[in-house]
Amino acid sequence: MPVSTRASAAGGQPWSSAAPAPASAPGRGGARREILTNHHHHGLKEKMRALTLFYEQHKQQLASSQGGGARGRRSIQYAVGEVGGDENGRNAEEEDDVGRKRHDAVPAAVLRENMAPPEERAPPPPPAPPPKSSHVVVFSRQADPTEKENVSHGGIATMSCPIKKAAPALPAPAARKLSLGGGMAARLKTAGEAGAGNGDAAGSRIMVFVRLRPMSRKEKDAGSRSCVKIVNKKDVYLTEFASETDYLRLKRVRGRHFCFDSSFPDTTTQAEVYSTTTSDLVEGVLQGRNGTVFCYGATGAGKTYTMLGTMESPGVMVLAIKDLFTKVRQRSHDGNHSIQLSYLEVYNETVRDLLSPGRPLLLREDKQGTVAAGLTHYRAYSTDEVMKLLQQGNQNRTTEPTRVNETSSRSHAILQVIVEYRSIDGGSIVTRVGKLSLIDLAGSERALATDQRTQRSIEGANINRSLLALSSCINALVEGKKHIPYRNSKLTQLLKDSLGGSCNTVMIANISPSNLSFGETQNTLHWADRAKEIKTKALTTANEEVLRVTDSETDQAKLVLELQKENSELRQQLARQQQKLLTVQAQTLASNASPQQSPAPSAQISTPCSTQRKVKRSILAGNCFNTPDSKRPAAENAQVRDLQRKVKAMEAEIEKMKKEHLLQLKQKDEFIRDLINRKTSNVPEAATCERRVATRASVRKAQKDAAAAGELRSPSHRFTSPVPTAKKRTFWDIGGNSPSTLAVNGRKTRSHVAAETPKGTSMLLQPGFARQRAIH
């Protein structure tokens, strides 16, 4: 842009503020007016006057509308909207451009005013008081047709007007709300108020919950601070701590804000987590719908504790199974329920059955979805049976210690519970099938946080690979793409129905409060915030199948249902009797071990695996095996005495069988010894003569005998010297063509041993020996 000075614009004659301008010729004055008219700064003075007048008008409007508060602010927003901007205003680039134009216009106006003669100058406008805080607002302006050069592009001018500074809503530090658009916050607020109790709302999108674990002792010893704060049980504030010497990160936004359906602080119990997240899914499964609960988070964030828990505080899996059997027992009067479960894991991109370990399983797709071919399904009749199967599967699951977690899960575990409800409604059989999937994902981890160049690093790479595939599927579902990459991992293939199918899905994100794990916590919250936008298929109808039957078939179906119900009750009674038998046997063993002590009550007596059984009873609050000894009837005591007598008789019989077995072993040893002695005594003395066939086996045996007899050995220690009384076979004897051999035996064999020593000496040199000279 060319630069013009006052001297050049005035024809090279500067004016003084004290002296008047000299008179000039008419031609020269016309030239000067032509220069000023064609100059690009011409008209800025008029523009500044108009802006100042407009500013004064709006200043008066603001002063009059201060009592209205929000009404005045809305009027400014409406004025902004008339220009064509949206409700959020211009973006940062447009604001910068407008600000630069405004600052460029001020010195230009000053230059235009100084170029004018003193008598033509207008008095400057009164200075406005500086506002405490300014906000850029855009207004429309009617352009004068005679001043075309004063009209900016689009007819837009800029100015700044003071606004009332709003008080902060929370005493928290400055925070930035992520991935929340204009109406997203209101929608999430409405969904959060509804909670997880609305099953229809849960079917439209994935419900996301966040759980914060307490600070561990190791983190406290390391001097870590808490960087996570939960407000109103929904909002999560994440604060980043940085040192003052970290100059590259001083200007970064330290606060981050996330909003979820519900957030659990570190003081939340397992029962509260289950009632908020999973209890409604169990009810939906009984009605014939599918439900999925899975935990996500970094290693050591508390995923396994949330899903499995401990004996004192059981997790979501145990509480869901207990609640499921309780509700089935309450509703079994109007129909028949059957419960099947399977337990599998995804370890290093291979699917394995935890209840019956063997070779890896193959994933196949059918009408029901993705299934694992060859997976074992067990039919359970009580909570106790499910607990045994769950404990067996957890023992087969891969868990290894790492630098971060001593009991780190190295695989993704999936427990699937299939509930089938069958009832008779009029002349038809109604069957409802619901599936509940409880998934414990392995922890995402960095390679630096675990052991490098070991098996742990390979496992961590496969874990991160499957979680990355899961993130890709979530991003594709959020963006509404046609192709979802489910086949990139075995985990995503198994979760296909849970993510994009007709299923109620709940995700629990576990995070750590320590600032040492800030990166992992931030990634987990971003991942959960992204998963919040996944839309699943609405569950309008349940998985229900109606089969029409005739009257005769209806009677048969009723009979089948009654038999199945009776079978279930008998199985439960059998389980109780087995538990009682184990208790009685343990009591008998304890009384035999310490007869002088008084027998303890049956509730305190444990089986050989006493610790596990006692803890298992603490998990199942509704266990029907906790009957005290004082309430048992007399008939049961008589039965106990009969069982004790039977146990004693069996023990005596076992001792007798042991003695007989020892006696048989002794007789067997004596018989073997006699056979050996008889064999050695019946060996003829002629058999002790050496064979005349030089084989490798006979040579080795002859070497040992020669050491005692004083025979000479060759330097190679492989062949013995010939005995004077018995000569070795000749070349013809080895070939089997010797006449003496044929005459005696009448047949030719390569391994024949001559009965008599041949009279002719062999001319074949023995290896390692010199030729023998004939003695005449």
UniProtKB/Swiss-Prot annotation:
The answer, when asked if Coiled coil is one of the entry's keywords, is: yes
Q: Where is the composition biased (Pro residues)?
A: 123-132
State any single GO MF term. ATP hydrolysis activity
**Residues annotated to bind ATP:** G297, A298, T299, G300, A301, G302, K303, T304
Gene symbol here is KIN8A
Chain intervals with Low complexity compositional bias: 7-26, 593-604
What keywords sit in the KW lines?
Answer: ATP-binding, Coiled coil, Microtubule, Motor protein, Nucleotide-binding
What's a GO biological-process term for it? microtubule-based movement
Q: Which family does it belong to?
A: Belongs to the TRAFAC class myosin-kinesin ATPase superfamily. Kinesin family. KIN-8 subfamily.
Record Gene3D superfamilies: Kinesin motor domain (3.40.850.10)
- What is the name of this protein? Kinesin-like protein KIN-8A
Give residue ranges for domain Kinesin motor.
205-534
